[in-house]
Each structure stands twice: as structure tokens, then as C-alpha cells.
Amino acid sequence: VTAGDSSIYAAPGEEFTRDQALMAVMLQSANEMSVAVAEEVSGSVKKFAELMNWRAKLFGCKNTHFNNPNGLPDENQHTTAHDMALIMKAAADNESFQTIASTASYTIPATNVSGGDRVLTNNFSMLANNNAAYYQYCTGGREGYTEASGSTLVCSAQKNGIPLIAVVLQGTSGTTATEAASLLNYGFDNFNMLSLGDNDFNMLSGGDVYVPVGTTADVLTTQDGEVQDGQYSRQYLFGGTAVGTSVMAATQEEDTSLVDTSVQNIDAARNYTENRNNLPYFIIGGVGILLLLLILLRIIKIAKS
């Protein structure tokens, strides 16, 4: 951490609670607190970066590598928009993260070193209703800037029950929120949720897919996984693109004649996945803090259980 990086100006030896550290990282993008959290959890920044990379792989990230906990410039650190979307999805699904992300302000009282309060204000422009970049459907996110990465932003939003994620990398300062809003508006205007609950028997979970407006269930094809413990997963494809899954109960009466496992559709799904992963690398920027928060929230949850 160097002069000019986002900080709450914590002093050496100053003591903070876990909640205070979380809020400092999320609301103020406090880089020194990110390093302190990494060292507290793993003993060193290097060890924590290994934990971050392991966790990123669990989320499905294939083209991301962390070398520090805050996303500041490092020649061995990179990501893609697709991978950042996967990390943001995990964050959006985490209730504790969403609570922190939606906090407008938080006060850290006097510590063993500081005699006064620190008032932390949420600096994410898309959530601040007094900011020109405010986006009413936004549910959380992060933005950051370094000279190396340019402006970066990841966010989640929900409108009419449809959740979306937008990622902007290597953006121009002051425009990334507008660009993210444009991406979200395009998604909300051109895609909707199609419920397949009435089209399948013995559906246990899932069955909601996101497809272009006007799409009907009869144009979707399906692929079924292997039966395990009396259940199997069914993947729905639109034009060879995977758009959703459901968990089905395996019964003797189940009609498998509707299952489309043609080589053409399998190859289309595989090619789609490969094309999405063959993406250019970008410098992570400050949005790497998201994964740090998810790891710490996971550790806190385990400690409380």
C-alpha cells in the first residue's frame, strides 16, 4: 500500500473488530485494512492470495490470478470480465455481503490509538441516491481505479425479479457507472425469465431460465446428467447456449424421449463455454476486494456455526 491509495489511515498496532475491518474494506476501499485482514487470516499476503485463487476456482473462474488482496497493480495479477461476473454473482447470493454493500454509512468509534470517530461513507456511486450515477435497481457492487487498470466496476441489479450482473474493465474515469447502467438496461429490456415448472414432471429445484424476450419453452433443448441418489440435473439450452438448469427426480415413469443429447447440441454448448473462456486478460484494479470480503464472511460464518 502506497501514499494515495484508498485508506482509513489506520496506524501500526491499532486494533479493529472484524465488522469494522469488513466495513472499512467495503465502504472505504481501505487498502491497508485489506492487507491486515489477509495477514490475520492466512499469516501473510502470499498465503491469502493462494486462498483467493483457490476460492476463485470454486466459483468457476478459469482466467483469474490474484497476487494481493486488494487488486492493486501486480504484473502477475489478472482477470476477465466473465470471471469477475462469477465472483460478483457469488457476492450477490451472499446475504451478509449484501447487507454490508447496502450500508450507507458506518462509524468506527475511538480505538486504542485513535481518540475520535471514523465515519465511513459508502463510496459506490450507483448506490448513492445523491450521485448522478445512482441506479435504482442496483443491489451492490464495487468500483476502483488505478493508472494501470483504468476504471473498473462490477455490480449486481434486480428488476421485476430478474437479477443481472454488469462488469466494466479498463473504463474511463467517471463513465464506468453509466456504461454499467447501459449494459443492465439492455439486459432488462431484451431478456426475461421463463419458468419451466409447468413443462417438466418431478422438478425439485431450478427451472427458471433467462432468454430473449418472446422466447417460448418449445424452442429450448435439454441435456440430462447422470442419475445420482435418485436425482439428476437437466440443462436447458437456447441455440446451443446454456441458459439454466433444474434438478429432477428420477422415476421409472420419467419420459426420457424429450432429452436432446445430439452431438450438435453438445458441441454447441462446449464451443460456447470455450469461447467465453478464451477472453483477454485485464488488470484487476480495486474490485479484487470483493473476493477478500467473501472469504472473510465465509470464515466468520464457519466460526459462528
Regions found by a protein language model. Name each.
Residues C61-K62, P73-H78, H82-S305:
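Domain-terminus/edge residues, biased toward the C-terminal soluble/receptor-binding domains
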Residues V1-H82, L86-E95:
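Active-site-adjacent loops and short helices of periplasmic peptidoglycan-processing enzymes
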